[in-house]
Swiss-Prot record:
Homodimer. The gene is guaA. Residues 203-395 form the GMPS ATP-PPase domain. It is an enzyme of class 6 (ligase). The active site is at 86 (nucleophile), 176, 178. This is GMP synthase [glutamine-hydrolyzing]. One of its GO terms (molecular function) is GMP synthase activity. It comes from the Bacteria. The keyword ATP-binding applies. Gene3D superfamilies: 3.30.300.10, 3.40.50.880, HUPs.
Length: 520
C-alpha cells in the first residue's frame, strides 16, 4: 500500500537486491520522498502512486533465466525520468531490445569507471576521460544497447557500464552508486534527482512533523491511544509526536523489566512524566521477569519468555485504560519493506528479532504507526526537531530483551547489577574520550566464565567481562571499533577496581559477519 503525500516522490522498484534500502536512503538524504515496492506490484500501483521519477534496483537473478523477476514496457513508456541499476540496467536492455549475455568474466568489488561523454548524470565529477571509483557486482553483462541509447561510461569488464537516452531521461548504470564504496555515488543520485528529473527536494523533518500531526489527529479523532514505551529512541519519538498531536488522549505504558541499563528507568519516567507531562503508567516488573528467567540459559527461551511476560504485563495495564481504541507502535520503514520481499520467499532466521511482539488479537486495537515512513536516521532527526536532546536520540541501539542477552547463561539479580555497573563505566569512558558518536553500538557482556586473579595480595576467582564496540552504517554488517589503547586500558582498570565480581576484562574484535553484533 502506498502512502498518501503531497511531496514529489520517487518509486523504487525492488528486484531483490540486498542494498535496495540503501537506494532509498540516498534518495531521502537528498531531501526527496521515495518508497520501495516489489517488481510484481510496481506496474499496478504506479498510477495511484504518481511518481515524479522511477529507479530500478539491482538483484541477484539473471535476466537470462526463465523465472527471473521482470516488468513489461509500461514503466519505460510513461515518459518519466528513470534510473536503472545493475540488474535493472540488464532488464532495461532486455525489455527494450538490447542484448544481455552470460559467460563473460564478471566484475565484483571496486572498479574504475571511465567517463566517456559529458552527461548530466556525471555533472561535477571527474569529467570526460576521468575515472570514478565505483562498486560492481555482476556476472552477466550488456553486449548491445537499445536504440536511442549511447554509452557515457565504461569499465574493464563492462563496455556499457553507463548508458543514457537523454531525450527520454532514461539512464542505466551497471555499478551500484548507492553503496559507500562508490565514492561519488551520492552525487550521482543528486544529479539524477535534481539535474535530470528536476525535483525540488521538499522532504524535510519539519514538513513531516507538521503533516504527521494532522494525520494522527484525523485518524484518532477523540479516541484514546496506548503507547508501549521502552525508553528507546523509536518509541520515545513516536510518543512525543503523538502527544503533540492529541495531548492527554495518549497514555504511555512503561514496563520496567529489571533488565534495562543503569538508572534508565528513572530517566524515562523523569523525561516523559515530568518534562513532557505525558500520562505515564510505570510498571516495575523486575521481580516478575527475573523470577521467570531463573534457571533459563538458552537464548531463544530467554527471548520468548521476556516477550511473553512483556505482553502479559502490557495487556493487563492496557485493559485498565478505559476507552482505548488505538495502539501506537514505533514501526520503521525497514520493517515495512522487509515484510514484503521482492521474491516473496522466506529468509533464514538467525535469531528472534530483538523487538518484542504484538498484543493479543482479542484486544482489537487499531494501529497508529507515525514512523512507518522513516528510516532510523530520519527518526533521530525528527526527535531533534521535536525537541528531544541530541544525546538522547543519538543513543546506541538497545535490544528489546535488554541485558538478558548480554548475560550468556543463567540470569540472576546479582549478575544484572554487575553488568549494569560495568556497562555504565564503559559508556562513560567512551563519552569522556569523545568517541560515542563514532560508534554504532557499544556494550559490555558478562561472561559465564571465571578466572584466577590477584587483587591486593589475595587470590581472586571472579567473572570475565567482555567489551564490544562496532562501527556500521545500518547494522547489517559491522566492523569492530579500533579504540585507542589508553581508553580501553582506563576502562578495564576502572571496571576491575569499581565493580565487585569482575577481575578480567577482554575486548571483542569480531566483525559481522561472521559474528553478530549482540552475543545472543
Amino acid at each position: 500500500m502506498t502512502q498518501k503525500t503531497d511531496h514529489q516522490r520517487v518509486l523504487i522498484v525492488d528486484f531483490g537486491s540486498q542494498v535496495t534500502q540503501l537506494i532509498a536512503r540516498r534518495v531521502r538524504e537528498a531531501g526527496v520522498y521515495c518508497e520501495i515496492h516489489p517488481f510484481d506490484k510496481a506496474e499496478a500501483i504506479v498510477d495511484e502512486y504518481a511518481p515524479s521519477a522511477i529507479i530500478l534496483s539491482g538483484g541477484p537473478a539473471s535476466v537470462l533465466e526463465a523465472d527471473s523477476p521482470r516488468i513489461g514496457r509500461k514503466l519505460f513508456d510513461l515518459g518519466l525520468p528513470l534510473l536503472a541499476i545493475c540488474y535493472g540496467q540488464q532488464l532495461l536492455c532486455d525489455v527494450l531490445s538490447g542484448k544481455v549475455e552470460g559467460g563473460h568474466a564478471g566484475e565484483f568489488g571496486r572498479a574504475e569507471l571511465t567517463i566517456g561523454k559529458d552527461s548530466p548524470m556525471f555533472q561535477g565529477l571527474a569529467g570526460v576521460g576521468g575515472v570514478e571509483t565505483v562498486w560492481m557486482s555482476h556476472g552477466d553483462r550488456v553486449t548491445a544497447i537499445p536504440e536511442g541509447f549511447e554509452v557515457i561510461g565504461t569499465s574493464t569488464g563492462a563496455p556499457f557500464a553507463a548508458i543514457a537516452n537523454d531525450a527520454k531521461k532514461i539512464y542505466a548504470l551497471q555499478f551500484h552508486p548507492e553503496v559507500y564504496h562508490t565514492v561519488n555515488g551520492p552525487a550521482m543520485y543528486r544529479n539524477f534527482l535534481f539535474n535530470i528529473a528536476g525535483l525540488k527536494g521538499d522532504w524535510t523533518m519539519a514538513a513531516f512533523r507538521q503533516e504527521m500531526v494532522q494525520k494522527i489527529r484525523d485518524q484518532v479523532g477523540d479516541g484514546k491511544v496506548i503507547c508501549g514505551l521502552s525508553g528507546g529512541v523509536d518509541s520515545s519519538v513516536a510518543a512525543v509526536l503523538i502527544h503533540e498531536a492529541i495531548g492527554d488522549q495518549l497514555t504511555c505504558v512503561f514496563v520496567d523489566t529489571g533488565l534495562l541499563r543503569k538508572n534508565e528507568a528513572d530517566q524515562v519516567v523523569t523525561l516523559f512524566r515530568d518534562h513532557y507531562n505525558i500520562p505515564l503508567v510505570h510498571v516495575d516488573a523486575g521481580d516478575l521477569f527475573l523470577g521467570e528467567l531463573a534457571g533459563v540459559s538458552d537464548p531463544e527461551t530467554k527471548r520468548k519468555t521476556i516477550g511473553r511476560l512483556f505482553i502479559d504485563v502490557f495487556d493487563k495495564e492496557a485493559a485498565k485504560i478505559e476507552g482505548a481504541t488505538f495502539l501506537a507502535q514505533g514501526t520503521l520503514y525497514p520493517d515495512v519493506v522487509e515484510s514484503v520481499s521482492a521474491r516473496g520467499g522466506p529468509s533464514a532466521v538467525i535469531k528472534s528479532h530483538h523487538n518484542v511482539g504484538g498484543l493479543p488479537d482479542y484486544m482489537k486495537l487499531k494501529l497508529v504507526e507515525p514512523l512507518r515512513e522513516l528510516f532510523k536516521d530520519e527518526v533521530r532527526a525528527l526527535g531533534v526537531e521535536l525537541g528531544l536532546a541530541p544525546a538522547f536520540v543519538g543513543r546506541h541501539p538497545f535490544p528489546g530483551p535488554g541485558l538478558a542477552i548480554r548475560i550468556p547463561g543463567e540470569i540472576t539479580p546479582e549478575k544484572v547489577k554487575v553488568l549494569q555497573d560495568a556497562d555504565a563505566i564503559y559508556l562513560e569512558e567512551i563519552r569522556n574520550a569523545g568517541l560515542y558518536d563514532q560508534i554504532w553500538q557499544a556494550f559490555a557482556v558478562l561472561l559465564p566464565v571465571k578466572t584466577v586473579g590477584v587483587m591486593g595480595d589475595a587470590r581472586t576467582y571472579e567473572n570475565v567481562l567482555a567489551l564490544r564496540a562496532v562501527t556500521s552504517t545500518d547494522g547489517m554488517t559491522a566492523d569492530f571499533f579500533e579504540f585507542p589503547w589508553p581508553v580501553l586500558g582506563k576502562t578495564a582498570t576502572r571496571i576491575i577496581n569499581e565493580v565487585r565480581g569482575v577481575n578480567r576484562v577482554v575486548y571483542d574484535v569480531t566483525s559481522k559477519p561472521p559474528g553478530t553484533i549482540e552475543w545472543e
